[in-house]
Amino acid sequence: MNNRFIVVEGLDGSGKTTIVHKIVKYFYNQKITNVITTHEPGGTEIAYILSELIKNKSKNEKLTDLSELLMLYAARSQLLENVIKPALFKGDWVIGDRCDLSSFAYQGAGRKLNSVLLNMLSQYVINDFFPKLIFYLDIPSELVLSRIKNRKVLDRIEQESLSFFNRVRSYYRKLAFLKENIIMIDASQPLEQVCVFIYRYLDQWLCDLYK
């Protein structure tokens, strides 16, 4: 069922949302119109509420790293069970902006949370229901910070340090070399070149998928 589940991953400011829309356009050009998009954290009413709690600083209370992780997995569970699985069960394609991998990179490598806890949460919530294909948009952390600083409002995570984003990026890159379903792309290139690479890859990938 997850053959139709594709995700775009990467640091904040790497261009994930743009690429998700470009992939949807690619599918439409291939006459595949039963496509939905998702964004983590969010995508359902409850997941959106959790997303707001995660992203916005409280005036009177500090959100702990553990609470952040638990809320992310709660939001992910809501999205997976209420949106992603039902869509895939119907035969739709799902193009996601982030997935379980983000927590391993951001909360695991970035926040330095316990890997045993992360694996346990992933097993219970995801239960090996992973995307068939992940495009990881690789971009230097310095470029990320220069891009996101131009945004009007930065959320809690976007305000993190260069060393934090370096740890997150290192984890993404390491995993991309180890996992066959993670395709690493140099996202510091012009958008047109990134899209050409993705379209060519999808051409071959879809051909192999439907052999």
Swiss-Prot record:
Reaction catalyzed: dTMP + ATP = dTDP + ADP
InterPro entries, per database record: P-loop_NTPase, Thymidylate_kin-like_dom, Thymidylate_kin_CS, Thymidylate_kinase
UniProt-listed GO biological process terms: dTDP biosynthetic process; dTTP biosynthetic process; dUDP biosynthetic process
Positions of ATP binding: G10, L11, D12, G13, S14, G15, K16, T17
EC code(s) of this entry: 2.7.4.9
Signal peptide region: none
Single GO MF annotation: ATP binding
Record bears the keyword Signal: no
Cross-referenced CDD domains: TMPK (cd01672)
Coiled coil: none
Family as reported in the entry's similarity comment: Belongs to the thymidylate kinase family.
Name the record gives this protein: Thymidylate kinase
Gene (UniProt): tmk
